C-alpha cells in the first residue's frame, strides 16, 4: 500500500518532501533567519518549528512528526560549547546519538532523520544543510510507514 | 451425521467466494482468528486462540465515522462496512461469550449498529474442544468443552471428518449446500460421546458468588487482593466477554474521525473524569469493580455471569493473579453479620 | 560464563528459603518493616507470584527458586509504608536507579539480597511441550510434562534470555545477603545478540520489528511490569498533546515501544521483566538491549550498578561521539 502511494506520487509529479525542522531559538533559527535576510536560496521543503534549545527536543517530537506523515525530520542546535544555556546541547547530543542509532536499528532509512549544528552566523551553511537534507529525503521518497500511522483518523494531510 | 474434512474443505473454499471467513490460523503471535481464503490455511490442532474472536465483532480500534468541514458545509461519512461472514472454529467458551456480548450491544434499550450489523451478518461455526487446557474451567460456568450454545453450526473433530450438528436456522441455511452427510460409525459415536461428556479438570464454584458479592462491597477482602496487580490491560484484552470501550475524536485541522477503542477497568485512566476526579483511582477499587462487574452487576443486569471460563486471563497475567483463586477467595470470605 | 558456588536446587536452595523466612519473621516481629515483598508459589507450574507478607503467620508462604521471575522493584514504588524487598541482582539495580531518581526513601526500604542464577522462561518451554501440566526442578534439571510432549531440560537451556547475558547476578545494594554469591568473571559486556541484529540489512530489521509490533496489543503489561516505568502519566495516556491514537496499527505500536525504550535509555537494568510480562511474546528486549549497548559503548555506562555513578543521560562530556551528525 505504501509502495503504491509512492509510485503514484512519483509518476504524477515530482516528489517534494515535507520536512519538519526543529531549530533552536538561539543559533539555528537565527541561522535560518540569516539565510533569509541574506537571500540564500534553499528548497522550500522545511516546516520550521522553533524550540528554546536543542535540549528541549523530546524524542517523541521526532516520532510524532513521522507518525503524522513528515517525510523527513531535521534537528539543529548550537554548536557544542555555544549553548545559550551552557549545556543544553551537550545533554541533547547524548539523546540524539541514541535516537539516531535506535531509529536505524528498527529499520528507518539513513537520512530520514538528520541532526546538525548550525550557528547564528552560518546562514549560508544553513541553506546548504537544508539542500543536503532535502536531496537525501527526496531520494528516499515519501515516508515509508515505519512510523507513519496509516489509520490514525484524519491525520492524512 | 458427519462430513469428511475433504468434502467440508471443498465447501469451505466455495463459501469463501461469498463470505469473509474468519478462522484460526497460526501466525507470529500464536494461534489467532484471521481472514482466510482456503480451508488449508486453517490451523487444525489448537487448544484455543491466544486472543478471543470478539475483536471480529468488536474491533480493538474502530473508526465509527469521519467528518470534514469545508466552509460552512460539514460532510459526515459513516464508516460501517459489513459483509457476510463466517466465523469458523469458535470454541464453546467464545461462542457463549458472544451471547453475553449480545446482551450488552443489543438489548431493549440500545442496539449498537457497529456490533450488531456484523453479528447479524455472520454465521458461527463452533468446534468442540478435544483437548482441554489446564487453565480451562468452562465446565464450572454452565457450559462444557463440547457445548453448542451460541454456535449456528457445531462441529466435533473426529480426525478426518467432522460430526455436524445444525443448531439454528442461520446454520441450516448455510448447511443447505452441504450434501453428503453420512451416519457415524459406532466407534465414532463412542468418540463423540467421550468428547461430549468431557469436563474441565479445573473447577470453581460460582453457585453462590453473586449473592455473596451483594454483601461484599465493603469487605476487607479487597484490601489485599489487588496488591500484586500491575494494572495492565492484558486480562481485559484477552477476555472474550470484556466489552468496555472509549470513544475519542481524532481531529486534524478541518477533518477528523470518531474512533472507538477498547478500554479496560484495570487502567487508572479508565474512570478518570474530565474534572480530574477519579472515582476508582486505587487498584483496590478497580479489582473490586472487575469482580463485581463479571460476577454480580452483569448477573443483575443481564441474568448471566460475564465469565466463560476460557482461562485466557490466567495465561496472560504477568503476575499470575489467577481469577480462579479470586473466586475461591470470595467463596471463603466469612461475612460479618451486623 | 557464570560459575556457581552452589548447585541449583537441592539443599542450598531450601536453606535460602529458610533464611528468607527467618529474616522476614525477624523484620516483621521487630516492627522494622510493615510488609515483606517476596514470592509465593503460583497457581501455574513453573510460575511464582509476588506475595505481600504483613503478618508472621503468612511467612511460610515465601519461597525462592528459579521461577521467581517478576521484578519486585516494580512494587516498591506502589507499596506504601516501610517495606522489605527480596531482590535479585537485577531487582537491586532497579532499586538503585529508583533511589537515584528519588522515587524511594532509602530508610523505608530494607533490601533482602539473594544471588540469582537466572530465572526460567516458561514460554521457551511451552513452545515445545505445549501447555505445561506438571513440572519439577531438581539438580539443575527441569522436568516438564506438557500437553504436546514431556521433556527434560537442563536449567541453562530454559534460562531467560536476560539471564543468559546477565553480568550482575549478585545484588549491588542490599541490607542483608542470603545464601552464597555467584562468581562472575571480570569481562566487558558482550552484546552478541545486538550485533547479530545489526548485521542484518535495514530491510530485514524493518521486517523483523514490523512483525514483532504486529503482535502487540498495547495492554501495557511491559510498561507496568517495568520497575522504572513509574511516570504518573505515561506519554501513551497523555491526551494533550496526544501522542498516540490508541490504535493498534504496527507503526503506532513501534512508536510506543520506541518511545518507551528511549525513556529508558541509560536507565534500563535489563531485568527482562517487560519481555516476560508480554502476553503476546513481543521481542521488546531486542530494543532495550540495543539501547544498553549504545549507552555502554558510547558513554561507558551501565545503569544501576552503583549509587555513585550518575545516569548516562544526566551527564555529558565535551568529547561525546557525534557520528549521528548529518554528513554535509
Please annotate each region the language model reported:
Chain B
Residues 206-227, 245-338:
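Ferredoxin-type iron-sulfur electron-transfer modules in oxidoreductases and energy-metabolism complexes
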Residues 20, 235, 313:
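Residue-level detector of anion-binding/catalytic polar loops
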Residues 226-236:
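Extended amphipathic alpha-helical segments enriched in small hydrophobics
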Residues 7-11, 235, 261, 322:
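General structural feature for long, well-ordered alpha-helical segments within catalytic domains
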Residues 1-214, 242:
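Iron-sulfur-associated redox domains of electron-transfer enzymes in respiratory
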Residues 234-241, 246-250:
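A donor-sugar binding/catalytic signature common to diverse glycosyltransferases
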Amino acid at each position: 500500500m505504501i509502495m503504491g502511494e509512492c509510485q503514484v506520487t512519483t509518476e504524477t509529479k515530482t516528489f517534494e518532501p515535507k520536512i519538519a525542522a526543529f531549530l533552536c531559538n538561539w543559533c539555528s533559527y537565527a541561522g535560518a533567519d540569516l539565510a533569509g535576510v541574506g537571500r540564500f536560496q534553499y528548497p522550500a521543503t522545511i516546516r520550521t518549528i522553533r524550540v528554546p534549545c536543542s535540549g528541549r527536543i523530546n524524542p517523541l517530537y521526532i516520532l510524532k512528526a513521522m507518525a503524522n506523515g513528515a517525510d523527513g525530520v531535521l534537528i539543529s542546535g548550537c554548536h557544542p560549547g555555544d549553548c545559550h544555556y551552557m549545556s543544553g546541547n551537550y545533554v541533547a547530543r547524548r539523546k540524539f546519538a541514541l535516537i539516531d542509532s535506535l531509529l536505524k536499528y528498527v529499520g528507518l532509512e539513513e537520512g530520514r532523520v538528520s541532526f546538525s549544528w548550525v550557528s547564528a552566523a552560518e546562514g549560508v551553511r544553513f541553506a546548504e544543510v537544508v539542500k543536503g537534507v532535502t536531496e537525501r529525503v527526496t531520494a528516499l521518497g515519501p515516508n515509508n510507514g515505519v512510523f507513519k500511522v496509516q489509520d490514525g483518523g484524519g491525520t492524512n494531510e | 451425521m458427519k462430513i469428511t474434512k475433504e468434502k467440508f474443505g471443498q465447501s469451505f473454499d466455495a463459501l469463501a467466494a461469498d463470505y469473509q471467513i474468519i478462522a484460526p490460523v497460526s501466525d507470529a503471535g500464536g494461534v489467532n482468528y484471521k481472514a482466510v481464503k482456503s480451508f488449508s490455511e486453517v490451523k487444525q490442532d489448537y487448544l484455543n486462540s491466544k486472543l478471543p474472536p470478539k475483536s471480529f465483532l468488536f474491533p480493538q480500534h474502530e473508526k465509527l465515522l469521519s467528518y470534514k468541514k469545508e466552509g460552512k458545509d460539514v460532510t459526515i461519512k459513516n464508516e460501517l462496512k459489513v459483509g457476510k461472514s463466517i466465523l469458523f472454529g469458535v470454541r464453546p467458551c467464545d461462542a457463549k461469550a458472544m451471547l453475553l456480548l449480545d446482551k450488552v450491544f443489543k438489548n431493549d434499550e440500545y442496539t449498537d449498529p457497529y456490533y450488531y450489523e456484523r453479528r447479524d451478518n455472520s454465521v458461527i461455526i463452533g468446534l468442540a474442544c478435544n483437548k482441554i487446557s489446564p487453565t480451562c474451567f468452562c465446565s464450572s460456568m454452565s457450559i462444557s468443552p463440547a457445548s453448542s450454545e451460541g454456535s449456528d453450526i457445531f462441529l466435533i473433530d473426529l480426525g478426518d471428518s467432522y460430526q455436524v450438528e445444525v443448531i439454528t436456522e442461520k446454520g441450516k441455511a448455510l448447511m443447505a449446500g452441504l450434501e453428503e452427510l453420512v451416519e457415524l460409525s459406532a466407534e465414532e459415536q463412542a468418540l463423540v460421546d467421550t468428547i461430549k461428556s468431557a469436563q474441565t479438570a479445573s473447577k470453581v464454584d460460582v453457585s453462590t458468588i453473586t449473592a455473596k458479592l451483594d454483601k461484599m462491597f465493603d469487605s476487607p477482602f479487597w484490601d489485599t487482593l489487588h496488591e500484586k496487580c500491575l494494572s495492565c490491560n492484558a486480562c481485559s484484552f484477552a477476555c472474550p466477554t470484556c466489552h468496555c470501550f472509549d470513544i475519542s475524536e481524532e481531529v486534524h485541522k478541518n477533518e477528523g474521525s470518531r474512533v472507538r477503542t477498547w478500554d479496560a477497568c484495570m487502567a487508572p485512566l479508565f474512570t478518570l473524569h474530565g474534572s480530574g476526579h477519579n472515582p476508582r483511582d486505587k487498584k483496590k477499587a478497580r479489582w473490586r469493580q472487575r469482580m463485581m462487574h463479571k460476577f454480580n452487576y452483569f448477573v443483575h443486569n443481564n441474568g448471566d455471569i460475564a465469565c466463560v471460563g476460557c482461562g485466557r486471563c490466567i495465561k496472560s497475567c504477568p503476575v499470575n493473579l489467577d481469577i480462579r483463586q479470586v473466586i475461591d477467595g470470595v467463596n471463603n470470605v466469612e461475612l460479618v453479620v451486623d | 560464563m557464570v560459575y556457581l558456588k552452589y548447585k541449583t536446587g537441592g539443599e542450598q536452595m531450601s536453606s535460602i528459603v529458610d533464611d528468607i523466612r527467618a529474616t522476614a519473621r525477624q523484620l516483621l516481629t521487630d516492627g522494622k518493616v510493615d510488609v515483606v515483598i517476596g514470592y509465593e508459589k503460583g497457581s501455574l507450574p513453573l510460575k511464582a507470584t509476588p506475595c505481600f507478607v504483613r503478618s508472621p503467620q503468612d511467612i511460610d508462604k515465601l519461597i525462592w527458586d528459579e521461577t521467581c521471575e517478576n521484578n519486585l522493584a516494580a512494587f516498591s514504588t506502589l507499596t506504601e509504608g516501610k517495606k522489605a524487598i527480596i531482590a535479585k541482582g537485577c531487582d537491586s539495580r532497579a532499586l538503585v536507579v529508583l533511589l537515584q531518581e528519588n522515587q524511594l526513601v532509602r530508610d523505608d526500604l530494607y533490601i533482602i539480597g539473594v544471588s540469582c542464577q537466572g530465572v526460567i522462561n516458561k514460554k521457551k518451554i511451552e513452545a515445545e511441550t505445549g501447555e505445561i501440566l506438571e513440572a519439577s526442578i531438581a539438580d539443575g534439571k527441569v522436568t516438564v510434562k506438557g500437553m504436546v510432549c514431556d521433556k527434560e531440560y537442563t536449567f541453562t537451556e530454559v534460562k531467560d534470555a536476560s539471564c543468559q547475558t546477565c553480568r550482575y547476578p549478585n545484588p549491588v545494594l542490599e541490607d542483608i545477603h542470603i545464601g552464597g554469591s555467584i562468581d562472575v568473571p571480570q569481562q566487558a559486556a558482550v552484546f552478541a545478540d545486538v550485533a547479530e541484529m545489526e548485521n542484518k540489512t535495514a530491510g530485514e530489521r524493518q521486517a523483523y520489528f514490523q512483525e514483532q509490533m504486529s503482535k502487540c496489543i498495547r495492554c501495557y503489561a511491559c510498561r507496568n511490569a517495568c520497575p522504572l516505568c513509574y511516570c504518573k502519566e505515561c506519554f501513551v495516556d497523555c491526551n494533550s498533546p496526544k501522542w498516540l491514537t490508541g490504535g493498534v496499527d504496527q507503526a503506532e505500536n513501534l512508536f510506543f515501544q520506541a518511545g518507551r525504550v528511549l525513556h529508558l535509555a541509560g536507565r534500563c537494568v535489563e531485568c527482562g521483566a517487560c519481555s516476560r510480562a508480554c502476553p503476546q511474546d513481543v521481542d521488546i528486549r531486542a530494543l532495550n538491549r540495543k539501547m544498553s549497548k549504545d549507552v555502554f559503548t558510547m558513554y561507558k555506562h551501565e545503569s544501576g550498578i552503583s549509587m555513585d555513578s550518575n545516569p548516562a543521560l544526566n551527564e555529558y562530556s565535551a568529547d561525546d561521539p557525534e557520528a549521528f551528525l548529518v554528513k554535509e
